[in-house]
């Protein structure tokens, strides 16, 4: 562009180049503004203060024409006035904006894109082209995984055999024996035998299974900190609590086991009994147990907000004295002197039978010294379990199991047992047979519950009831024929865990059991062994506590049938 001498053409080309290549639009705004040289000329036209023009005048000033020998010193020549010719203006500013005027446009830019127009690429197109070039370069590159083969060191350099001097036992062993018959090696023992003889005997901790409830080793689980006073420790150690941290989901029984585990580690000399002997009691700050019952073993420890508890042996439970009135009246007043005397005598007799160790004294005077302490512990544990079962038996509880009808079809039912009645409600299913109505039977009409058969994981449960004149909806599981030797066979003794007949065997009872004026029917259920045992224990415990005439009559008739069967054999 330096070869061009047309200043107007150069300015137009520069102006249009900047405007066409600037994406921001700022260049076009500046260059299309007013003509600055004209404004400058109008403002300083007559003042003569143009700085650029002044320097241009000094650089091109003419030499003096005078012939004098003395040069002019400090002579100030007035500057010529500024002219419009001294400024180079943008061309085309004073012209019209007519599109047909070609002098206002650049000579290299076409106004119509159809005719030889060049469109600038966007940033996206440039990036796509760069990615395409990078992919082409990557296609020509081959990746090779370099794996250096590591030579394993020789094991002989690390494991050198060390020559040890022979011990006394080996020297005695290597010495030739004088007599070939002398083969005894008395006095020679290995180091392991010597260490085992010197080390104390370490028995396995029987409470080790409760160590998993330690809350100090758990991450992301809720824990609970409790201060437990140990009542079995001596007096100096009893006043300071044992601080434990257990998981919040641990039950009271598991907390007791964990406390026993910590006690066995911290106080190994203190003898501990089984978990059935201990209970957690509410306590005060001064280690005084309150006169409240212990915490329920089945409840989680997070349910109770106590921070201090006491682990002590269970307090002896007084036996429950019950007076039965065999009369036809539903209730009887206790205002008579005879009734009060009988009740007081029964209470005094029950209190006299209680001994200090929680057991019952022998009224005959026989000494109980022949029983070992281990037998007494087992008997005490059994009484505790029986007492807990008696307390839990009247509570309402539901079980999910299958009922078997006379066609050996199984239906899912819900069995509800409480101290007042039993309820059988069929679960909703999408099978083709219709829905049966629920059955509710008072507990007074229930005679017996037994387990007929025990398999690997299943058990067959039977519940005997008193038959009504109108058979209920579930009566399809039993027939209504009177009992005789050829129709039914009562499997006596099957509830004690013996082998009984299955419903498909010939010895299975499919009829009713009746005596003089009482007719019995039964329901057969198929469930797992654990659920069957829970139902058997719960229902029989309720029946034993009530001791109804119906149950006694049923057991009497069953014993008679068993005796007749044994006589026939």
Swiss-Prot record:
The keyword Phosphoprotein applies. Disulfide bonds: none annotated. The keyword Phosphoprotein applies. It comes from the Eukaryota. Keywords: Apoptosis, Phosphoprotein. Component of the target of rapamycin complex 2 (TORC2). This is Stress-activated map kinase-interacting protein 1. It comes from Drosophila melanogaster.
């Amino acid at each position: 562009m330096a070869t061009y001498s047309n200043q107007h053409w150069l300015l137009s080309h520069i102006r249009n180049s900047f405007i066409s290549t600037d994406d921001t639009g700022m260049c076009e705004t500046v260059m299309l503004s007013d003509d600055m040289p004209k404004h400058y000329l109008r403002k300083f036209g007559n003042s003569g203060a143009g700085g650029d023009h002044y320097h241009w005048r000094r650089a091109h000033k003419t030499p003096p024409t005078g012939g004098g020998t003395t040069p002019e010193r400090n002579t100030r020549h007035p500057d010529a006035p500024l002219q419009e010719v001294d400024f180079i203006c943008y061309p085309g500013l004073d012209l019209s904006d007519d599109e047909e005027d070609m002098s206002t446009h650049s000579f290299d830019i076409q106004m119509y894109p159809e005719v030889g127009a060049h469109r600038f690429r966007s940033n996206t197109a440039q990036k796509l082209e760069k990615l395409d070039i990078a992919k082409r370069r990557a296609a020509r590159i081959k990746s090779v995984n370099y794996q250096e083969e590591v030579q394993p060191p020789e094991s002989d350099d690390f494991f050198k055999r060390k020559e040890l001097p022979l011990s006394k036992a080996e020297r005695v062993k290597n010495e030739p024996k004088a007599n070939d018959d002398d083969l005894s090696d008395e006095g020679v023992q290995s180091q392991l035998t010597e260490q085992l003889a010197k080390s104390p005997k370490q028995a396995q901790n029987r409470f080790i299974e409760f160590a998993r409830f330690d809350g100090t080793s758990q991450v992301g689980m809720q824990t609970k900190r409790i201060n437990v006073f140990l009542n079995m420790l001596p007096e100096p150690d009893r006043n300071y609590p044992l601080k434990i941290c257990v998981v919040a989901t641990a039950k009271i029984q598991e907390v007791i086991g964990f406390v026993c585990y910590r006690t066995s580690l911290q106080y190994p000399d203190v003898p501990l009994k089984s978990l059935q002997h201990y209970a957690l009691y509410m306590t005060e700050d001064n280690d005084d147990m309150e006169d409240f019952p212990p915490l329920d073993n089945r409840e989680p420890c997070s349910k109770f907000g106590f921070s201090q508890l006491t682990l002590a042996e269970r307090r002896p439970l007084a036996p429950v004295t019950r007076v039965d009135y065999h009369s036809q009246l539903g209730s009887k007043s206790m205002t008579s002197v005879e009734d009060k005397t009988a009740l007081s005598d029964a209470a005094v007799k029950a209190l006299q039978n209680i001994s200090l160790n929680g057991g019952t004294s022998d009224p005959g005077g026989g000494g109980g010294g022949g029983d070992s302490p281990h037998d007494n512990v087992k008997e005490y544990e059994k009484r505790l379990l029986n007492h807990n079962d008696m307390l839990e038996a009247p509570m309402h509880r539901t079980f999910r199991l299958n009922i078997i009808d006379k066609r050996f079809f199984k239906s899912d039912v819900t069995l509800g047992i409480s101290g007042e009645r039993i309820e059988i409600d069929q679960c909703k299913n999408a099978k083709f047979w219709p829905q049966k109505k629920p059955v509710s039977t008072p507990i007074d009409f229930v005679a017996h519950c037994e387990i007929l058969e025990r398999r690997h994981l299943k058990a067959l449960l039977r519940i005997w009831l008193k038959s009504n004149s109108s058979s209920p909806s579930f009566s399809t599981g039993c027939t209504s024929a009177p009992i005789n030797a050829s129709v039914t066979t009562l499997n006596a003794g099957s509830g004690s865990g013996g082998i009984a007949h299955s419903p498909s065997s010939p010895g299975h009872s499919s009829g009713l059991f009746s005596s003089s004026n009482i007719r019995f029917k039964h329901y057969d259920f198929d469930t797992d062994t654990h659920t069957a045992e829970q139902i058997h224990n719960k229902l029989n415990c309720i029946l034993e506590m009530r001791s109804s005439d119906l149950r006694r009559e049923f057991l009497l008739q069953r014993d008679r049938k068993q005796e007749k069967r044994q006589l026939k054999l």
